[in-house]
Swiss-Prot record:
Species the sequence originates in: Oryctolagus cuniculus (Rabbit)
The family this protein is said to belong to: Belongs to the potassium channel family. D (Shal) (TC 1.A.1.2) subfamily. Kv4.2/KCND2 sub-subfamily.
Motif (Selectivity filter): 370-375
PTM annotation: Phosphorylation at Ser-438 in response to MAPK activation is increased in stimulated dendrites. Interaction with KCNIP2 and DPP6 propomtes phosphorylation by PKA at Ser-552. Phosphorylation at Ser-552 has no effect on interaction with KCNIP3, but is required for the regulation of channel activity by KCNIP3. Phosphorylation at Ser-552 leads to KCND2 internalization. Phosphorylated by MAPK in response to signaling via the metabotropic glutamate receptor GRM5. Phosphorylation at Ser-616 is required for the down-regulation of neuronal A-type currents in response to signaling via GRM5.
Gene: KCND2
Protein keywords: Cell junction, Cell membrane, Cell projection, Ion channel, Ion transport, Membrane, Metal-binding, Phosphoprotein, Postsynaptic cell membrane, Potassium, Potassium channel, Potassium transport, Synapse, Transmembrane, Transmembrane helix, Transport, Voltage-gated channel, Zinc
Comment text on domains: The transmembrane segment S4 functions as a voltage-sensor and is characterized by a series of positively charged amino acids at every third position. Channel opening and closing is effected by a conformation change that affects the position and orientation of the voltage-sensor paddle formed by S3 and S4 within the membrane. A transmembrane electric field that is positive inside would push the positively charged S4 segment outwards, thereby opening the pore, while a field that is negative inside would pull the S4 segment inwards and close the pore.
Record's protein name: A-type voltage-gated potassium channel KCND2
Disulfide bond entries: none
Amino acid sequence: MAAGVAAWLPFARAAAIGWMPVASGPMPAPPRQERKRTQDALIVLNVSGTRFQTWQDTLERYPDTLLGSSERDFFYHPETQQYFFDRDPDIFRHILNFYRTGKLHYPRHECISAYDEELAFFGLIPEIIGDCCYEEYKDRRRENAERLQDDADTDNTCESALPTMTARQRVWRAFENPHTSTMALVFYYVTGFFIAVSVIANVVETVPCGSSPGHIKELPCGERYAVAFFCLDTACVMIFTVEYLLRLAAAPSRYRFVRSVMSIIDVVAILPYYIGLVMTDNEDVSGAFVTLRVFRVFRIFKFSRHSQGLRILGYTLKSCASELGFLLFSLTMAIIIFATVMFYAEKGSSASKFTSIPAAFWYTIVTMTTLGYGDMVPKTIAGKIFGSICSLSGVLVIALPVPVIVSNFSRIYHQNQRADKRRAQKKARLARIRAAKSGSANAYMQSKRNGLLSNQLQSSEEEPAFVSKSGSSFETQHHHLLHCLEKTTNHEFVDEQVFEESCMEVATVNRPSSHSPSLSSQQGVTSTCCSRRHKKTFRIPNANVSGSQRGSVQELSTIQIRCVERTPLSNSRSSLNAKMEECVKLNCEQPYVTTAIISIPTPPVTTPEGDDRPESPEYSGGNIVRVSAL
């Protein structure tokens, strides 16, 4: 059964998303189940422990799906006589109802991604969702795709700069995520400051600043201090122009960037300045220029790059486009209807201001939006009655879409809050990982010195005895692992500091033999689970000892460096103190070296009486592998 399921899965996944399976041969035949079936048998479906029962004919109504075809036999268990699916039982209820009723519905409380995965597994396409749920399903799916794309773009911009990134990619990354570097952060705050200055200057230049000498009429600040405001506007426009050109040059897709809303806002914000530079002193042209200067107020929308709340508001309006369209259409119909009624109701009054139906539009708009300026009021009884109805209908028309807009705003706001929280947690987690990796070698060696390899060496003439300290279960397991490695590989693992101390003792004191103070070599610390090779300990010479004291000892001849992607390689040289250029180049891209010291003893010398005796202190031909780099 397991082999059949494994062979079926790739074809089921391909068929579920509408792709034809690519294979050299046909699909494997489903396993034959030796059981008797009636024409309309009762089938038991076990979905993660939840049992569903239905008729076989109900499932076979749709033979192109998983449950309606013979492919469901791959999931049949003869012992329980059930079809077992390790899927979500809550969503499966809606899928099974589709076989019963022929209508597929989308549960609003379910995750859109999980729902799509279940449909893909059972071989159902989203296009068969009923009309009552299809629009909401498409909206949720589009919003989810946009959110995932935004999260992916944010994650890409928040990642650390790679060495392979080009200058163009670095500039775009600095614009999208100013916190990547100090210069990007400075430019971010400088542009924000000039945006605020530009908006404030656009407002202040219309404030009256008194009359200038030779003029009786009071002039606005923009005309009285024209040079100062021109210089200020020039500085702001220069900053905005440089920002726009840099964004255009660094954009991954310039065509997409030019079509974006923020790009259009940038162009509209700086365009009036350049048009004013080339315009003549003609009064007609100057009047058009004054009208064009109104577009400078769009610079305030540049704050959306600096404000998350404005971006959330934009996403909300975009997601509520259908509701806003319904509101606009309803208001338009109501305005036309009530303006027509009010015109004919007030037509008989001589003091009426409802001179035409378009003139009555203003009264209808002000009344339906519950503003009520009072500049136009009905005079007749019929006009007052219809005006009251217009006011009440306006409250109903405007109030209906508002809860939907508020709900979408709340949902998008909380989604962004959760996304920001996830990114902050990911950033903190990566920081902890980097901190742990940077201090891993020191922490490992410190733990060995404190608990793993910090035992006192108790040597005697007959047999060395070791005293171990009580440690945690992790330390005990680590001791046991080192103990088994020493017995099976005939290697001995010691701390680097203990190794140097032992070497100094060997250089100063000449004793017959000595054992390295390793917890893994202790008798009684761990159980004897590995067959021990015949091993004799020996003196470890110090590399720092002078040449006269070393004798014929060969200095640290070989270092083993393991590659992540390939088999272990060795890099040999006559001395580890030599430069790396003098050695054979490693044939791997990412070598790593562990912090350890391994002593390889030479075979023991057997006396004619059959007893083993330690070798002479010269250690001719002894090899020591010392790896002290991380």
